[in-house]
């Protein structure tokens, strides 16, 4: 179920009502109906929320991520506008279908429209089943292109299941599309079963463990990212917030006790964000029910701010 953006979410400190150099994003955000918005030339950044945690529930995780998109909006709205980049809020999609895949399909239809309007599209979850919806949107928008999927995540999310969950997205992509590849950074060895590592070997999944990038990113790993991007026509980028150490991101569905720092994630992201092949970015698993001082939502908002500016 699609709902347009809620203007009440966009509030914050006002330093000036006339001097644009003192504006914050809540003062410049544009609220749009995605079904009625069509632009002549791609511009700015679009935001579409995936207010869904049914996939987390089906994956036996702790629910609450459906509140993630609005928590991120509230945090992002009070951040400063540093460059003249328009940002459009298209609202949220909610789960009201019998099956999760139907909600993912609905989200994909709307996200694909957004891709046509903006240089970058920012998709905010919600559970990491947003990644399969993101992929479906990419395939709708680019039916004949090779898609490179880059995921910063503690988990492979290649579980085998009878239906979509927050832990199946990338298996669904790989087994349904010979023209898509998967590269994941931040894998926690103790949090993925041997069968998942075996599946990665079988499918030729490229991955980098958290231990390899815990303190710095070597030139070899930077080269791996660059080579992966160069091999594909378009890039889909997704971040699961459970890859972040719980000291920085306690409000997630599956917190990490030895995760990555925000600085490492931003450095990894800089290899990807800004590349002309990048089409969409998603950030998943922000769970306000377990957050502390809105720390996780603020971190996602900071990521978005860095990606835009």
Swiss-Prot record:
Gene3D superfamilies, A to Z: Ureohydrolase domain
Residues annotated as binding Mn(2+) 2: 153, 155, 240, 242
Pathway: Amino-acid degradation; L-histidine degradation into L-glutamate; L-glutamate from N-formimidoyl-L-glutamate (hydrolase route): step 1/1
Keyword Manganese: yes
Molecular function in Gene Ontology: agmatinase activity; formimidoylglutamase activity; manganese ion binding
Residues that hold Mn(2+) 1 according to the record: 128, 153, 157, 240
Protein task: Catalyzes the conversion of N-formimidoyl-L-glutamate to L-glutamate and formamide.
NCBIfam families per the UniProt record, alphabetical: hutG
Name this polypeptide is given: Formimidoylglutamase
Origin organism lineage: Bacteria, Bacillati, Bacillota, Bacilli, Bacillales
Gene name for this UniProt entry: hutG
